Amino acid sequence: MNARQAITPALVTEKAVKRLPRWALLLFCAAYVLPGLFGRDPWKNADIAAFGQMWSLALGQASWWAPHVGGVPPSGGGILPYWLGGAVISALQPWVDPALAARLPFAGLLVAVLSLTWYATYHLARTEAAQPLPLAFGGEAPVPDYARALADGALLALMATLGLLQLGHETTPEMLQLTGSALFTYGLAAAPYRAIKARLATLFSLILLAGSGSPFIAILLAVVGLAVCQRSTEDSMRQHLRWVLLSGILAAGLATGLSWLGLSGWHWRVSGMPNIGAVVRLFLWFTWPALPLAMLTVWSWRRQALRRHIAVPLLSVLIGFGASLAMGGLDRALLHALPPLAVLAAFSLPTIKRGLSSAIDWFSVFFFTGTALLIWVVYGAMYTGWPHSTANNVAKLVPGYAKAFSWPLLLMAAGATLAWLALVRWRTARHQNALWKSVVLPAGGVALGWLLLMTLWLPLMDQSRSYRLLMERIKPHVRVGSCIAAPGASAGLLTALEYFGHYSVDGRANSGTKNCEVLMLSVGGKQKAPTVPGWHLVARERQRTQNSESVAIYRRDH
């Protein structure tokens, strides 16, 4: 028995590497990426705040070297994400709505993250240390088929993570950061097989991270890359070291330049000790089901923990976990851990026990079927008024909800539900040998839930999470085109005033109050509107209920 046979936990037959049909994989990806891309407004809070910075660049209201909305610069995110969104808005106007134009490149980034995770897993699974045990009488899995099956599993595991669902569909700098992280993992994975592509990926990955507000994570990844390349016995990895070093130097230089310009380059965002219970809950739901599978991988492959197929994703995951903890349990920092966590989860599939696999399957069946049923019941209540209690709850949560029935959206939702039932029947009706079988139901359930929300509930969610309703309530009190001083207002509210209300806004501390005839202050749901010397209160409007966000509108005394 050689060394690899002694320490490799995987035993995989040729039947187990059954290929997931490409049409099915593409359908999964389409059902995950496309819903929510069309037919909605920018949503609160980070989504519309980032969109506002991009829109102001496209309109020429702000310098490309100093983006701002109403004089308020972005709170983070570097500069590259705003350039990306602003450039696409500028290129597609006036033919495409600015909000949709801004979402298009970020949907492309989500596709890139999914693709990079697939290819990173594929190349890592081809390494000698990752191969399963050879069978005594033959019939073991061919290397390309084995690698492809694990890559399919990694992609499904990534789509199944609940944390990527909302944040992955936003127009925010975190998506460019996530692309940079995934690109770096791909570079380390593909270096022995696709040298030129791997070098280019590594070179640009850390630059993307530094230019989108995560220079510290870029430097930590560079340290990981240098360590992996330095201890590798492969010449290709040793040669790759210089590209990791060059990328790290360029990333540090870019972050320094952004800081010199007054942007979020070396922006220290470490906060105090987070609540341990809250962090544990965040990590559990945000990373489900990839985290338990990744933990199984670390245990099963513990004797190969220093090999590249385990070390690269594991160290990247630890960086993402550490960044989230350092920022007080920030969920957006935890995004960095998801692609490498999915890669790690894929290597558990050859070793997973039938009991754990069945538990994941049945949990997915009951949880996602129940979620889909709830979505359908609420949808029916919105249009029929039955069940009465459900319809009343919807009316309380979104007062004045305007029904917007759509046959195409209804048919899409019905088709997705039938596809889910067919997938459940396929998975549970007979024993399946494919390695990726344990993650197909979680991925399918997440895709189903997201598609139902973005079809059946899209009008409801759009009215509850968009600023459009609040702007409609403000218009009777403030003439379109008026100048509004809104000191202390969030970038999201400033964007809404310009985009939905067509007002001229100034969010700076004192300058706007000298030039504008209207003053607007954000007021807590139950707080009393403050008295402002030289101004008289005209109205107070709320987004939805008595406890929701509200604004107080003042006019200057004459």
Regions found by a protein language model. Name each.
Residues 79, 83, 92-120, 144-151, ...:
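Loop-to-helix entry region of an early transmembrane alpha helix in multi-pass inner-membrane enzymes
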Residues 104-112, 175-183, 336-344:
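Membrane-embedded alpha-helical segments of multi-pass membrane proteins
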Residues 3-26, 174, 191-558:
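Membrane-embedded architecture of ER/inner-membrane glycosylation machinery
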Residues 117-120, 164, 184, 294, ...:
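Hydrophobic/aromatic residues in alpha-helical transmembrane segments
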Residues 50-76, 80, 87:
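Extracytosolic helix-loop segments that constitute the early lumenal/periplasmic catalytic or substrate-binding loops
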